[in-house]
Amino acid sequence: MHRYLLALLCCIPVSCQSANDEEPPLQIRIATFNVAMGLETQGALAAALESGSDARLKQLAAILQTARPDILLLNEFDYDPVVDAAGLLNRNYLAKGQGGRQPMRYRHHFRAPVNTGVDSGLDLDRDGQKGGPNDAWGFGRFPGQYGMLVLSKFPVRTDESRTFRNFLWSAMPGALRPSNPDGSSYYPDETWLQLRLSSKSHWDLDFNIEGRELHLLAFHPTPPVFDGPDDHNGRRNHDEIRFWRDYTDPSGADYIVDDQGAAGGIGPGTPFVIAGDFNADPLDGDSYPGAVAQLLDAPWIDSSCVPRSAGGAEAAREQAGANRRHRGDPATDTGDFSDQQVGNLRLDYVLPSKGLHVIGCGVFWPAAGEPGHDLVSMSDHRLVWLDVQL
């Protein structure tokens, strides 16, 4: 437990369940963090990883050495199949104690292609031209921009894991197909029938945790903005979130087919955690109505442990602006955004299945004067963590 104490000084943990007399032998911390390392040019992240001197990556390492998650999803971390990003991050940053913190290492990782920056060959943004970043299956200037990486202290059963990058949006029953104000379809049939649902990907990763099974359902849906009255991004965000609701519902997953051709959802009773930057706040922001409630309100998902931080409450109070109009508790915010437009929001989640023994959760967002306050500027998002006993 001592390895969590420093992290607990930097955020407000929420105790969700008291330990019983027969504690399971293993407690683990699962976290998600949008690190905003989707850089503007291909190869820029690789160069920063190789240098060992990038200021933001040093901040990232310091945050991880403080919070010390056992399983971690990084969002907006460029994917390049020829670059050993996990190895470089381990060797050049995590293996070096940042600011006197204890070094660490992740022995296992998972990475895979994503849809961002992969040219669709279609004119998806209807500007009369093909090949632009908005014409990729997911917005991006090059393949792999804004990718995902999972780091773990436990092995991933890759043979039992699944990806859904190629799943078609139109294959989802009742999909929210975007439409123009006059009722006509925003995408012509030829385009609609080719569109992929995932803006990055959906991953179901099966972990072997000292003989115990736990699935990480990882994703990063598109922001519900940067569109028009058709709300094509808002609707896609809604359905990307809905995918995991259906996948974890034994009665709703028959239509789902993974990239390897296997059908169906997660097995009944299988323990799981859904993690990522959902780009959807329960009460504020521009997401499609009820988008994140699809998961928060699912009877088989435990959303009772709501991560909080002192820094989130402080930031909303001091920045004011759009935050004054918000209905949500600012202590639960996980992102620091434009005060004149959207304000700060709760976008990042780690949601366990019912039945997992939840110990606590939190947001790494130290207030002024708390240890680590100087680190959070490395991203506009904050690390969110959940502790469970298996």
Language model feature labels by segment:
Residues V35, E76-F77, F154, P221, ...:
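Active-site metal-binding loops of divalent metal-dependent hydrolases
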Residues Q145, V150-K153, T158-N166, S170-H215, ...:
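Feature for exported/extracytoplasmic and membrane-associated proteins, marking the mature portion
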Residues A36, N115, P155-R157, T222-V225, ...:
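Short loop/turn segments at secondary-structure transitions that flank enzyme active sites
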Residues H2-A7:
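Sec-dependent signal peptide recognition
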Residues L8-Q17:
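Hydrophobic h-region of N-terminal signal peptides that target proteins for export
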Residues P155-T163, F167-P173, D206-F207, N233-I274, ...:
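Metal-dependent phosphoester-hydrolase catalytic domains
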Residues C16-M148, L176-Q194, E210-L214, D227-P229, ...:
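N-terminal, active-site-proximal structural segment of metallo-dependent hydrolase catalytic domains
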Residues L214-R235:
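Active-site His/acidic residue clusters
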